[in-house]
């Protein structure tokens, strides 16, 4: 059974960066093979992993909706074949990019084919890392709703921490079953930790299903890595080493 770890939070909190660092962490710990899933329509996880993406799952979805399926193959077999074709393969991990949201049309049968194909695909991996959009629509529609760890990422603000509480409510409403729901406050200045910790404890007291994973520091090196397009595997940064320490808690 695969271990599924999903990151969620409002835009700009660093979900994608932490997803990439977790993939690097898992490889470092020899916890492979890994399937990375970029479920954000504004996908860029591939950039942090140093790989290019040519096709997304949304293009498979649209071809199914238009019935662009050859006569000699069933719709499910076609779906399964296309899902494998759009995988970006790597030595230790593969990447699947969901792509843009639906346009108008009836997608219920399409979602059924895709969710069945994805479930079968995921059984081939020991670890699944999902970088979500804020509303988690993709994983909800495709029934990817059971996971071991769901990590809510907040920025270093009171408003961000309270938004994490609302995301916890959304998780319930979408019937997502997570064995562990964690809160991490990302890119936090050292002198704001004590103040923000009070609000984090307040949310955790109110939303008893949430556990506090910890704070992650600001890191001026991130911009340098981004500008030079250096993949996460080559980073030597304070954020990366601190994230490694937090991720150890997930696998105690």
Predicted regions, residues:
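Inter-motif core of Ras-like GTPase G domains
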Residues: 120-124, 139-158
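C-terminal lobe/tail of nucleotide-utilizing enzymes
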Residues: 172-252
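Conserved nucleotide-binding/hydrolysis micro-motifs of P-loop NTPases
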Residues: 41-42, 101-103, 134-135, 157-159, ...
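Walker A/P-loop phosphate-binding motif and the immediately C-terminal alpha-helix
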Residues: 4-41
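Conserved Switch II/interswitch segment of TRAFAC-class P-loop GTPases
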Residues: 133, 147-165, 190-192
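N-terminal phosphate/diphosphate-binding loop that engages ATP/GTP or pyrophosphate donors
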Residues: 28-90
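Cytosolic-facing regulatory segments adjacent to core modules
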Residues: 79-89, 94-132
């Amino acid at each position: 059974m695969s271990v599924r770890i999903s990151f969620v939070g409002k835009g700009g909190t660093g979900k994608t960066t932490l997803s990439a660092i977790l993939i690097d962490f898992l490889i470092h710990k020899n916890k492979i093979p890994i399937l990375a899933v970029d479920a954000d329509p504004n996908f860029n996880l591939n950039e942090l992993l140093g790989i290019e993406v040519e096709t997304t799952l949304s293009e498979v979805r649209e071809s199914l909706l238009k019935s662009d399926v050859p006569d000699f193959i069933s719709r499910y077999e076609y779906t399964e074949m296309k899902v494998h074709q759009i995988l970006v393969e790597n030595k230790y991990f593969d990447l699947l990019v969901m792509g843009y949201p639906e346009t108008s049309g009836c997608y219920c049968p399409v979602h059924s084919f895709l969710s069945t194909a994805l479930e079968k695909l995921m059984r081939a991996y020991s670890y699944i890392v999902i970088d979500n959009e804020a509303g988690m629509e993709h994983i909800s529609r495709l029934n990817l709703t059971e996971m071991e760890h769901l990590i809510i990422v907040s920025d270093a603000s009171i408003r961000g921490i309270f938004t994490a509480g609302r995301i916890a409510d959304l998780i319930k409403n979408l019937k997502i079953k997570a064995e562990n729901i964690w809160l991490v406050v990302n890119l936090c200045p050292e002198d704001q930790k004590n103040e923000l910790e009070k609000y984090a404890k307040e949310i955790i007291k109110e939303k008893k299903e949430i556990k506090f994973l910890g704070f992650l520091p600001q890191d001026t090196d991130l911009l340098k890595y981004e500008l030079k397009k250096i993949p996460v595997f080559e980073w030597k940064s304070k954020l990366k080493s601190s994230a490694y320490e937090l991720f150890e808690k997930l696998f105690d």
